[in-house]
Amino acid sequence: MESFEKRPRGRPVTTDPAAVGLTALKLFNELGIDKVTMDDVAIEAGISRSNLFRVFPSKAAVVWGGMQRITEELKNQLANNPETSVVKHLHQSWVGALSVLDNSLDTVRLRLKLIASSPEVYGWGHAQLEEARKILEAAIAKIEGPNSVRPKMISSALIAASMSVLTWWAESDDQRSITAVLDESLSDFESIFAQLAQGE
């Protein structure tokens, strides 16, 4: 591994997860995630290695941090949304769940750029994305019934489309909020399928 030059810094960053996470993400983006160790992150953040691992036990935890908040908010959104149309129910609830990210756009953009940069990094989040997908699948099955492939198919399509939109947003440096971009994109997605259905 290339030698890592310690950067000059002023007041050390505390073990606040947001501050430490942003420090790590900047290093990963600037130097390459494969070239930065967690020890390097601890040095740059001005904290001990043990304190770093209490906050983030791995690189994957840094990059995919925040997914637990999204899945918890998704459960709340789905439970409290009275919409009976499956499409509208999922659209509104998923966009609402991702609104928790709108107050940390710089951090989220760095995370998504890293996720888009490598299939391996993307794969680190498979379990968390699958958890969100299963929550969506259960919500669809509750409305439509469980005895078909549709709940799994629709939930999988929503996750895949959303990740495509979010990584595009990060790489394009679009200045809109995540929810604004996702809301518009999902509306377009719905329109495309509506047009296809009308053409049958």
Give residue ranges: language-model regions.
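Basic, helix-initiating cap at the start of DNA-binding domains
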Residues: 1-31, 35-47, 64, 69, ...
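C-terminal peripheral helix-coil segments that are non-catalytic and often amphipathic
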Residues: 1-3, 138, 142, 174-200
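Short hydrophobic/aromatic patch on the recognition helix
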Residues: 46-56
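A secondary-structure capping/hinge motif
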Residues: 60-62
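Hydrophobic alpha-helical connector segments
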Residues: 72-111
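Secondary-structure edge/capping motif, primarily at the C-terminal ends of alpha-helices
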Residues: 101, 112, 140, 165-173, ...
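Hydrophobic alpha-helical bundle segments that form small-molecule/ligand-binding pockets
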Residues: 103, 129-155
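Hydrophobic alpha-helical segments that form the core
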Residues: 115, 148-169, 180-192
